[in-house]
Amino acid sequence: MEPGFWHEKWQQQLIGFHQQDINPFLVKYWQTLALPADAKVFVPLCGKSLDMCFLAEQGHQVIGCELNELAVQQFFEENQLPMNQSAEGEHQHYQTEQVSLYQGDIFTLPQSITAQVNGFYDRAALIAWPESMRTQYAKQLAQLLPSGSVGLLVTLDYPQETLSGPPFAVSPTWVETHLSDDFEIQALACQDVLADNPRFVKKEVPWLNEAVYLLRRK
């Protein structure tokens, strides 16, 4: 997935991956992490997700990383949040009281930015990568997260041959095989969400499972 792919999606507003509501798994399971209210929470490939507003409402300091400039600007505009912008190395830093977004490549994000995070939340990042690049992303995420940090991972799984991603299918087996070296993994829930996703129904995908995992960085 080249950067130009995502820039084009945002430019044309072909952003079906953007959810208009807060993710139900986030609302239901976030408190199981037992993070302090003032915890710092990292959100990779954050887009303009409303989930960040939910995290900020819990009292957390949200640190996001997003490739596309338009996505970051729309987050602050649509939520009517005043922000300051500054250059920080290769990234542009957009900051408001509880949300700091770094616009740029997650693979060049300095580890110092996430060195103090307590938690993390990945809903649309892992599933954005084809299998050929997914392990590289997972290793980068692990490198950015301090030992002991806890978070939620939300995945989608379906017969990959029935639809070209993104989002790409990520099975429980893939999660266990490729993340267990760096994370303790606890599966929390899994449900069929096919009826809520017309694109998958139209393509006659037989099933679509959304799963949520609790991850703890080793």
Curated annotation (Swiss-Prot):
Keyword Magnesium: no
Pfam family for this entry, one: TPMT
GO BP, one annotated term: methylation
SUPFAM superfamilies: S-adenosyl-L-methionine-dependent methyltransferases
Keywords assigned by UniProt, alphabetized: Cytoplasm, Methyltransferase, S-adenosyl-L-methionine, Transferase
Subcellular location, record wording: Cytoplasm
Listed EC numbers: 2.1.1.67
Binding site for S-adenosyl-L-methionine: 10, 45, 66, 123
Transferase among keywords: yes
Molecular functions per Gene Ontology: thiopurine S-methyltransferase activity
Matching InterPro entries: SAM-dependent_MTases_sf, Thiopur_S-MeTfrase_Se/Te_detox, Thiopurine_S-MeTrfase, TPMT
Entry GO terms, CC: cytoplasm
Gene3D superfamilies: Vaccinia Virus protein VP39 (3.40.50.150)
Reactions catalysed: S-adenosyl-L-methionine + a thiopurine = S-adenosyl-L-homocysteine + a thiopurine S-methylether
Record-linked HAMAP family: Thiopur_methtran
Family under the similarity heading: Belongs to the class I-like SAM-binding methyltransferase superfamily. TPMT family.
Name of this protein: Thiopurine S-methyltransferase
Lineage summary: Bacteria, Pseudomonadati, Pseudomonadota, Gammaproteobacteria, Alteromonadales
